[in-house]
């Protein structure tokens, strides 16, 4: 009886320990929308093992496999960072740029948030020469481009601005990084290809349309949500910070301490125009009158278009036909 009681107490302790030290609570995965994949028509069959089910034409990713992959990635990155490994964060998607830059700067890592320049890893000589040019222009800018004409100064400023934008996160990169952490291997496939060619280990977020063969370790998750990207990248950054003696923000923390950012809603131009429209009597009258005018013009154009063109074979016939076509397009 005593042995059974002891076993039960040990089992309870193990369960409590597992719940306390889970890398991320499932509730936070659900809050971040990590489980949302793409439409079923857009999936990659190689992602089948990571997909839980289908709902309303959308693939649902298996959160349990997300949790396991994320914890495994944390351990690998943590061990590598403890040995002095270097990392580069890559995310050129509009909604991923800010998060990538924030976590890379937090871990003192390299990062690319603008267009990946071909040859960043495979043609280091050219990249280093452009970085040297960046440093030279910055020194010239300190003296306000003294000794050059106003026109030359303007051109130098444009060049400097472009170089700073493209090389902001890799200007201090002297050697090849050991690991690449990429938000979307599909979008940044050139970066992934160069990393594979140079033997850089790749850890990436895999949505339902991704190819898991492109990365060394894939984390099945939604790569279109700010909350999802922030959750995954913060945990991976925690692994680096923890190895250097810092504190984890999300990894192995209490649920109350994990505060996710808000998803930014970007309205399309059509929707914003629709929202700003005033539906009072005056505006409705104007819309009605303009609609009538447009419909009359459209009917006239249709009548003219139904009339057959008179074929003339003089030298101006082609010009006349082109002019007529352009007017119809307008």
UniProtKB/Swiss-Prot annotation:
Ranges where the record places region Disordered? 263-330
Cross-referenced InterPro entries: Ribosomal_uS2, Ribosomal_uS2_bac/mit/plastid, Ribosomal_uS2_flav_dom_sf
**Keywords on this record?**
Ribonucleoprotein, Ribosomal protein
User: SUPFAM superfamilies in the record, alphabetically?
Assistant: Ribosomal protein S2 (SSF52313)
Reply yes or no: does the keyword Ribosomal protein apply: yes
Q: Polar residues: which segments have biased composition?
A: 271-282
Bias class Basic and acidic residues marks the residues at 283-292, 313-330
Task: Tell me which positions the record assigns to the signal sequence.
Answer: none
The UniProt entry's coiled-coil ranges are none
* GO BP of this protein: translation
Skewed-composition ranges (Low complexity):
293-307
PANTHER family cross-referenced by the UniProt entry: 30S RIBOSOMAL PROTEIN S2 PROKARYOTIC AND ORGANELLAR, SMALL RIBOSOMAL SUBUNIT PROTEIN US2M
User: Mind telling me what this protein is named?
Assistant: Small ribosomal subunit protein uS2
* Organism of provenance: Mycoplasmopsis pulmonis (strain UAB CTIP) (Mycoplasma pulmonis)
What lineage does the source organism belong to? Bacteria, Bacillati, Mycoplasmatota, Mycoplasmoidales, Metamycoplasmataceae
Q: Which gene encodes it?
A: rpsB
């Amino acid at each position: 009886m005593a042995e059974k009681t002891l076993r039960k107490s040990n089992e309870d302790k193990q369960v409590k320990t597992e719940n306390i030290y889970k890398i991320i609570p499932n509730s936070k995965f659900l809050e971040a929308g990590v489980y949302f994949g793409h439409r079923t028509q857009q999936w990659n069959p190689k992602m089948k093992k990571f997909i839980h089910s289908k709902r309303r034409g959308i693939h649902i990713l298996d959160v349990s496999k997300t949790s396991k992959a994320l914890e495994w990635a944390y351990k690998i990155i943590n061990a590598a960072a403890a040995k002095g490994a270097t990392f580069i964060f890559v995310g050129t998607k509009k909604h991923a740029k800010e998060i990538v830059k924030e976590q890379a700067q937090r871990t003192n890592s390299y990062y690319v948030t603008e267009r990946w320049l071909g040859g960043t890893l495979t043609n280091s000589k050219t990249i280093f020469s452009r970085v040297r040019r960046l440093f030279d222009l910055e020194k010239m800018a300190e003296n306000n481009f003294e000794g050059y004409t106003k026109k030359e100064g303007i051109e130098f400023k444009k060049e400097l601005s472009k170089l700073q934008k493209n090389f902001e996160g890799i200007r201090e990169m002297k050697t090849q990084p050991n690991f690449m952490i990429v938000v979307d291997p599909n979008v940044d496939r050139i970066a992934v290809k160069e990393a594979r060619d140079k033997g850089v280990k790749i850890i990436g977020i895999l949505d339902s349309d991704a190819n898991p063969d492109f990365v060394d370790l894939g984390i099945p998750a939604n790569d279109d949500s700010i909350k999802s990207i922030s959750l995954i990248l913060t945990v991976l950054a925690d692994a680096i910070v923890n190895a250097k003696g810092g504190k984890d923000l999300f990894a192995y923390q209490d649920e109350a301490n994990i505060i996710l950012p808000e998803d930014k809603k970007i309205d399309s131009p059509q929707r914003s125009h629709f929202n700003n429209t005033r539906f009072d009597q005056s505006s409705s009258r104007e819309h009605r009158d303009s609609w009538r005018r447009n419909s009359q013009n459209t009917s006239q154009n249709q009548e003219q278009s139904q009339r057959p063109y008179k074929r003339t074979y003089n030298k101006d016939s082609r010009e006349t036909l082109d002019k007529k076509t352009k007017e119809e397009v307008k």
